[in-house]
């Protein structure tokens, strides 16, 4: 099955982010618990929704080569205010590495992202003249699942390239 995904090449700078690390199978990780921890941290520190925030999940390991139970991911809120904050509990401050990326835009439920990744890595990337770098990739969430129907969720996949 060939999916139609919008794609573009984009360069971005390093950005500081609040993050909560999860370890284990990407398909069963407790993302909502991690998001709740970060949002509660923001509320406790009177940052509100962190203003200009980007909501991102960074995937640090390749599930094709790393055992599922050892796969690491960081659930992140990246915003300018992060520079003024301190780590606390499970909430850390990390840098999301910038660089050159191929970006794919997917519209649909998060439950379909596994199929999207299969499509991207087995069909779409092989048709592009880009070299994927062995670095962390990330998802950027463009709307809020609390207020958006699953079929209307917008997720960008940011894959580092040469």
Question: What are the residue ranges of the model-derived segments?
Answer:
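A solvent-exposed interaction/effector surface
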Residues: 1-162
